[in-house]
Design a protein with these regions (language model features):
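A short beta-sheet element
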Residues: 51, 55-106
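Sequence-specific dsDNA recognition surfaces
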Residues: 6-55, 191
């Protein structure tokens, strides 16, 4: 049955007001939650405005969700993210990984592009996400769907690794056969 997503997720906007020493994370479209993604110091030394993301909660940057930068936090007991991020909890009736796959789907990415607002960058407010429809079968069926999608994702990941290895092999064989094209150790004629 189709339901309104907002009936199954709830905003969580708790700030690190006590300036606890909590790891700072970003959310990327390829790796999900990443510590020190940009390889530099956090823009602000004052992290009291940063939002806490407990284990199992979702977070996304409203101006990056259009490329799939959304994930649920499964790294630490709690982490913090930029104050710009939206953070939300999920109802026990909605399997987190099922929601994750839904939010990364082409259907949702197209819908985000259609409803997001902004002059320079598209921006998706949490209130807009609440209005998205989601097919919500029973929990057991959600878990079965997740198992299938997890297996497919694993196969895709392994195939991508194989392609990378084959690409490396082709490059190394080329170098063995013809040498470095810059140094031209075999004195190939150049036209």
């Amino acid at each position: 049955m189709k339901v309104r997503l907002g009936d199954y997720i709830q905003e969580y906007s708790v700030k690190n007001k006590d300036d606890e020493n909590i790891s700072v994370y970003s959310v990327t479209n390829t790796k999900g939650f990443c510590k020190d993604y940009f390889g530099k110091e956090v823009a602000s030394k004052d992290k009291t405005t940063y939002k806490i993301v407990p284990y199992g909660y979702f977070a996304y940057n409203p101006s990056r969700i259009n490329v799939g930068s959304v994930d649920w936090q499964r790294k630490e007991k709690k982490v913090i993210v930029s104050p710009l991020y939206n953070v939300f909890s999920v109802s026990p009736d909605l399997e987190r990984q099922y929601l994750y796959y839904y939010l990364k789907s082409d259907f949702v990415l197209q819908r985000i592009k259609a409803v997001a607002t902004g002059s320079v960058r598209d921006n998706l407010k949490l209130s807009m996400l609440y209005e998205f429809p989601i097919e919500l079968p029973a929990l057991e069926k959600q878990r079965k769907i997740v198992k299938i999608l997890d297996k497919v994702s694993d196969v895709i990941e392994k195939k991508e690794q194989e392609l990378e290895q084959l690409d490396t092999l082709v490059k190394s064989r080329f170098a063995e056969m013809f040498g470095d094209p810059i140094q031209n150790p075999y004195n190939w004629s150049i036209k």
